[in-house]
């Protein structure tokens, strides 16, 4: 196991945005639904909804996109705006601190434009209150003046589409959630879909992929395109320094092993979590508070970042009594259950 003083400040397989991710993602991001790999049910539905809105010359219904980090929520929002042939203005929940911040964005929208709010679950209550009439009636209620002289005025807004993105749909208030006419959940990608994504990204990055190279990267990418693209960049570095720049299965395996991403896509934190359950708590069940204390990690990080992939891949179970390591987890580490 990796000791505490060996732990890097950022995980290579962390699905949240790091360093150069945003610039690279923007450069290789698909622009149309036809180029969007995976999420077939979402692509099919959005294609119909977008075409219908265009035929009626109306604004698309407000859209909520939710799912784990790194699956393409921002990409999908930009594709929707592109397919509608309208402008998109982008912001995030934490940035909109005051009602005036949101009002400034809303009053600068043209008819049918898209306003994209990332991390929409982090909107402050005062900003959220302003959003309700804007979404429902295309009106902006603002207060003019202060104290006894303060008065409310209504401003008409052009019809627009709000796209909200969140990793925590359950954290949205019911009044906000109910105002979205379209709700889409993004799922983890399978290996074949990620292989296609890695191949496409390699083409844009001028990386020559040979047999098995893209698939080896995809297998360790935890079902997440952002992680796949990040691993591809590290494999490219390795191939250029230790080889001739070409990426095959052997090169990809060597590079990813060097950066501590194993065959299952685990890094030190995944192994630490599973081994804590198996070795310290006899396989579970163990409560979230105890598990967080045992591995020195925040509860939200365990629930939102570490656990979804482990559960989806069958290494971990959540039960009413706590977390349990599955037989597959024991098999991965070559261990036998103690009970």
UniProtKB/Swiss-Prot annotation:
Question: In the UniProt record, what gene is named as encoding this protein?
Answer: ruvB
Principal location: cytoplasm
Task: Tell me which family the UniProt entry assigns to this protein.
Answer: Belongs to the RuvB family.
Q: Where is region (Large ATPase domain (RuvB-L)) located?
A: 4-189
Q: Name one GO cellular component term.
A: cytoplasm
Supply the SUPFAM superfamilies for this chain: P-loop containing nucleoside triphosphate hydrolases (SSF52540), Winged helix' DNA-binding domain (SSF46785)
Q: Where does DNA bind?
A: 318, 323
Q: Where found, per UniProt?
A: Cytoplasm
Q: Write down what this protein is called.
A: Holliday junction branch migration complex subunit RuvB
Function comment: The RuvA-RuvB-RuvC complex processes Holliday junction (HJ) DNA during genetic recombination and DNA repair, while the RuvA-RuvB complex plays an important role in the rescue of blocked DNA replication forks via replication fork reversal (RFR). RuvA specifically binds to HJ cruciform DNA, conferring on it an open structure. The RuvB hexamer acts as an ATP-dependent pump, pulling dsDNA into and through the RuvAB complex. RuvB forms 2 homohexamers on either side of HJ DNA bound by 1 or 2 RuvA tetramers; 4 subunits per hexamer contact DNA at a time.
- Does Aminoacyl-tRNA synthetase show up as a keyword for this record? no
Cross-referenced InterPro entries: AAA+_ATPase (IPR003593), AAA_lid_4 (IPR041445), DNA_helicase_Holl-junc_RuvB (IPR004605), P-loop_NTPase (IPR027417), RuvB-like_N (IPR008824), RuvB_C (IPR008823), WH-like_DNA-bd_sf (IPR036388), WH_DNA-bd_sf (IPR036390)
Q: Name one GO molecular function term.
A: four-way junction helicase activity
**Ranges where the record places region Head domain (RuvB-H):** 263-339
Q: What is its EC number?
A: 3.6.4.-
Oligomeric form and interacting partners = Homohexamer. Forms an RuvA(8)-RuvB(12)-Holliday junction (HJ) complex. HJ DNA is sandwiched between 2 RuvA tetramers; dsDNA enters through RuvA and exits via RuvB. An RuvB hexamer assembles on each DNA strand where it exits the tetramer. Each RuvB hexamer is contacted by two RuvA subunits (via domain III) on 2 adjacent RuvB subunits; this complex drives branch migration. In the full resolvosome a probable DNA-RuvA(4)-RuvB(12)-RuvC(2) complex forms which resolves the HJ.
Tell me the enzyme class: hydrolase
Q: Which residues bind ATP?
A: 28-29, 70, 73-75, 136-138, 179, 189, 226
Q: Which GO terms describe its biological process?
A: DNA recombination; DNA repair
Q: Does the keyword Glycoprotein apply?
A: no
Return the NCBIfam families for the record: PRK00080.1, ruvB
């Amino acid at each position: 196991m990796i000791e505490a003083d060996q732990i890097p400040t950022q995980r290579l397989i962390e699905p949240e945005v790091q360093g150069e991710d945003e610039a690279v993602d923007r450069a290789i991001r698909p622009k149309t639904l036809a180029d969007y790999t995976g999420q077939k049910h979402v692509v099919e539905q959005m294609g119909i909804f977008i075409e219908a809105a265009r035929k009626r010359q109306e604004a698309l219904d407000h859209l909520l996109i939710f799912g784990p980090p790194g699956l393409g929520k921002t990409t999908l929002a930009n594709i929707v705006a592109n397919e509608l042939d309208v402008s998109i203005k982008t912001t995030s929940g934490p940035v909109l601190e005051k009602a005036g911040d949101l009002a400034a964005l809303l009053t600068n929208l043209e008819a049918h434009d898209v306003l994209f709010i990332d991390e929409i679950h982090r909107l402050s209550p005062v900003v959220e209150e302003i959003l309700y009439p804007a979404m429902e009636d295309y009106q902006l209620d603002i207060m003019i003046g202060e104290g006894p002289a303060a008065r409310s005025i209504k401003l008409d807004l052009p019809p627009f589409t709000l796209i909200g993105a969140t990793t925590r749909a359950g954290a949205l208030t019911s009044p906000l959630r109910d105002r979205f006419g379209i709700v889409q959940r993004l799922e983890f990608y399978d290996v074949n879909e990620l292989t296609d994504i890695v191949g496409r990204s390699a083409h844009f990055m001028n990386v020559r992929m040979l047999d098995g190279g893209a698939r080896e990267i995809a297998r360790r990418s935890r079902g997440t395109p952002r992680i796949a693209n990040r691993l591809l960049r590290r494999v490219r570095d390795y191939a250029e320094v230790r080889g001739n720049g070409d990426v095959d299965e052997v090169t990809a395996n060597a590079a990813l092993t060097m950066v501590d991403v194993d065959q299952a896509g685990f890094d030190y934190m995944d192994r630490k979590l599973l081994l804590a359950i198996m070795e310290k708590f006899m396989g579970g069940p163990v409560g979230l508070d105890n598990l967080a204390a045992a591995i020195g990690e925040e509860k939200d990080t365990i629930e939102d970042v570490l656990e979804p992939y482990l559960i989806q891949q069958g290494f971990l179970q959540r039960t009413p009594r706590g977390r349990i390591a599955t037989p597959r987890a024991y098999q991965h580490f070559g261990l036998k259950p103690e009970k």
